[in-house]
């Protein structure tokens, strides 16, 4: 690749400083090795603060004690969050036991956080333990390369345990796509695994020496489940099957949910349909989409660097034609597909191979030993005896997959004893999700994970008050507008602005194919509950059979749908 790009679809101008950082990083090495030996600070400094993200890490600090430490003239309590690369979310029990032990012995919080990108995160790794974390992952056959920053991130794959044969085929493609789009630099192996430096020049034939303009997310989706929320992602492969055989993919490009408060040039966006491809063209199309975005994406303004903005600027047809040219493939007409849901089916399900699958609801994805509810220990106990695999879902839950009939009762007993199965968990709680936010996320503006459980309790009370306690609303809370909890695809989305202040978005749908519109700006959680009380009451009495909350709000004109987010997302006052 020629990194000096020019042409009608290249954004000219002064490059963002992140581009300088990548160019000068020596293929993601920077001075990270020197920083590791600097005992004067618990953090990484200068460019390394951002470069470690390419290696799957974010530098954070405990914001609950930040002010107190500042008063004591101490630097923030720096610690690292590490995110594993786990395409499709599949992990073996043996691998799980390794990460469980590391979390217990080497992190400040002792927890494992399942994420809605089908992987897990360690929070609270001190700098002196970072190398140990990478070496542990390597020992069990895992890594954290390219799970953050301007690369193709962890590739998602629908976790439908019933369609075992089809899932396996789709999962294999998720792994192939992940491997094909990985950085080729040896920096990760040299820095963390003590591999010898090789006297050759690094090359990045797909990503280029300055990598992508912005993060890039990819999914493999098996209808009728949209558990991966395809419209939150840059590149999506929708599985098309004939019987139980995968024959090709519909390709959708340019989804993304992040925005910036107060900047109307940023907005969430749905992915656009490009067409259908047979299986043999999958990697060529994936590479062509990535390289087109690599060359045409905006490198002067990071807020507008995502694929969704490139498509809006150059046009979907222009981008699609360039992908076809680079791949040497013509898209066929989109094949029919339909989504009917996106939540996990909690509990026992039998697969076509006569094996059983147990989906455990993990509130907020946080596995920790709580008083009277030792969740983390329970999963470890199951891992010690389970012969199948674990599957992390895009809803932050955990599937114990491939359980023979003879082991079913034994595993259920362990799960119940440790609080991993709770018959009192409502369908509303199972369909609610939050990002991590405080105290560890540096971008958090409002509470999310710590806020959600009690907030859901209040919503449950409202549902019961109006006689629909067995119903649910897809509810998401995110602590800032970057969109990690995918609130911009929820029926009710709360986006944090300040402590106990949220923008309230309404009007998404249950299957994740409509962006919710802002209904009220910068209001308290109590005000949100008052609004929901009234609207849930109207839904309870005025809904049509099987009509979801978001669909009801749109049909009754309580709020107008977002039809073209680049143009109408911010017309909220006229649309309410």
Curated annotation (Swiss-Prot):
SUPFAM superfamilies linked: Nitrite and sulphite reductase 4Fe-4S domain-like, Nitrite/Sulfite reductase N-terminal domain-like
EC number: 1.8.1.2
NCBIfam families from the UniProt entry: CysI (TIGR02041), PRK13504.1 (NF010029)
Chain residues that bind siroheme: 484
Gene Ontology BP annotations: cysteine biosynthetic process; hydrogen sulfide biosynthetic process; sulfate assimilation
Record: residues binding [4Fe-4S] cluster: 435, 441, 480, 484
UniProt catalytic activity: hydrogen sulfide + 3 NADP(+) + 3 H2O = sulfite + 3 NADPH + 4 H(+)
Family from the record: Belongs to the nitrite and sulfite reductase 4Fe-4S domain family.
One GO cellular component term noted in the UniProt record for this chain: sulfite reductase complex (NADPH)
Keyword set includes tRNA processing: no
Gene Ontology molecular function: any one: NADP binding
Name of the featured protein: Sulfite reductase [NADPH] hemoprotein beta-component
Keywords, in A-Z order: 4Fe-4S, Amino-acid biosynthesis, Cysteine biosynthesis, Heme, Iron, Iron-sulfur, Metal-binding, NADP, Oxidoreductase
Keyword Kinase attributed: no
Superkingdom of the source species: Bacteria
Free-text function comment from the UniProt entry: Component of the sulfite reductase complex that catalyzes the 6-electron reduction of sulfite to sulfide. This is one of several activities required for the biosynthesis of L-cysteine from sulfate.
Organism for this UniProt entry: Photorhabdus laumondii subsp. laumondii (strain DSM 15139 / CIP 105565 / TT01) (Photorhabdus luminescens subsp. laumondii)
PROSITE patterns registered for this protein in UniProt: NIR_SIR
Record-linked InterPro entries: CysI, NiRdtase/SiRdtase_haem-b_fer, Nit/Sulf_reduc_fer-like_dom_sf, NO2/SO3_Rdtase_4Fe4S_dom, NO2/SO3_Rdtase_4Fe4S_prot, NO2/SO3_Rdtase_4Fe4S_sf, NO2/SO3_Rdtase_FeS/sirohaem_BS
Subunit structure: Alpha(8)-beta(8). The alpha component is a flavoprotein, the beta component is a hemoprotein.
UniProt cross-references to Pfam families, sorted A to Z: NIR_SIR, NIR_SIR_ferr
Cofactor remark: Binds 1 siroheme per subunit.
Cofactor(s) named in the record: siroheme; [4Fe-4S] cluster
Pathway membership: Sulfur metabolism; hydrogen sulfide biosynthesis; hydrogen sulfide from sulfite (NADPH route): step 1/1
């Amino acid at each position: 690749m020629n990194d000096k790009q020019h042409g009608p679809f290249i954004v000219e101008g002064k490059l963002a400083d992140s581009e300088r950082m990548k160019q000068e990083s020596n293929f993601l090495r920077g001075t990270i090795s020197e920083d590791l030996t600097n005992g004067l600070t618990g953090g990484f400094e200068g460019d390394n603060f951002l470069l470690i993200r390419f290696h799957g890490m974010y530098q954070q600090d405990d914001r609950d004690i930040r002010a107190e430490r500042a008063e004591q003239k101490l630097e923030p309590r720096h610690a690292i969050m590490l995110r594993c690369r786990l395409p499709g979310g599949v992990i073996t029990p043996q691998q799980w036991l390794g990460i469980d032990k590391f979390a217990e012995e080497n992190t400040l919080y002792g927890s494992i956080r399942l994420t809605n990108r089908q992987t897990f995160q360690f929070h609270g790794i001190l700098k002196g333990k970072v190398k140990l974390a990478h070496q542990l992952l390597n020992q069990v056959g895992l890594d954290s390369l390219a799970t953050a920053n301007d690369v193709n991130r962890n590739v998602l794959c629908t976790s439908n345990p019933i369609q075992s044969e089809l899932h396996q085929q789709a999962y294999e493609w998720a792994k192939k796509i992940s491997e094909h789009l990985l950085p080729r630099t040896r920096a990760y192996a040299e820095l963390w695994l003590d591999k010898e430096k090789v006297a050759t020049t690094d090359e990045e034939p797909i990503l280029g020496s300055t990598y992508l303009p912005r993060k890039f997310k990819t999914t493999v989706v098996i209808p009728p489940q949209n558990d991966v929320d395809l419209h939150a992602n840059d590149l999506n492969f929708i599985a098309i099957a004939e019987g139980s055989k995968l024959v090709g993919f519909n390709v959708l490009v340019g989804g993304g949910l992040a925005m910036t408060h107060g900047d109307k040039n940023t907005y969430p966006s749905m992915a656009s349909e490009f067409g259908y491809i047979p299986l043999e063209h999958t990697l060529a199309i994936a590479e062509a989409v990535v390289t087109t975005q690599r060359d045409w994406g905006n490198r002067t303004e990071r807020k507008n660097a995502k694929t969704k903005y490139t498509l809006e600027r150059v046009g979907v047809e222009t981008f699609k034609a360039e992908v076809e040219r680079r791949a040497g493939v013509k898209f066929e007409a989109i094949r029919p597909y339909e989504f009917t849901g996106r939540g996990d089916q909690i509990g026992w399900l039998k697969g076509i191979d006569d094996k059983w699958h147990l989906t455990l609801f993990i509130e907020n994805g946080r596995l920790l030993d709580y008083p009277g509810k030792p969740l983390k220990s329970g999963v470890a106990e199951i891992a010690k005896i389970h012969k199948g695999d674990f599957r992390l879902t895009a809803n932050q839950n955990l599937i114990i997959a491939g359980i023979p009939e003879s082991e079913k009762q034994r595993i259920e007993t362990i799960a119940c004893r440790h609080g991993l199965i709770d018959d009192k968990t409502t369908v509303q709680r199972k369909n609610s999700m939050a990002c991590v936010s405080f105290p560890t996320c540096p971008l958090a503006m409002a509470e999310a994970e710590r806020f959600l459980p009690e907030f859901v309790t209040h919503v449950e009370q409202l549902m019961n008050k109006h006689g629909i306690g067995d119903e649910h609303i897809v509810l998401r809370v995110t602590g800032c507008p970057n969109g990690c909890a995918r609130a911009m695809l929820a029926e009710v989305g709360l986006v944090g602005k300040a402590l106990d202040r949220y923008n309230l978005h309404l009007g998404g749908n249950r299957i994740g194919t409509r962006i919710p519109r802002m209904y009220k700006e910068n209001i308290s959680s109590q005000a949100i509950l008052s609004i929901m009380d009234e609207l849930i009451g109207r839904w309870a009495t005025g809904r049509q059979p099987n009509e979801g909350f978001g669909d009801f709000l749109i049909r009754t004109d309580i709020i107008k749908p977002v039809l073209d987010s680049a143009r109408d997302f911010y017309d909220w006052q006229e649309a309410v």
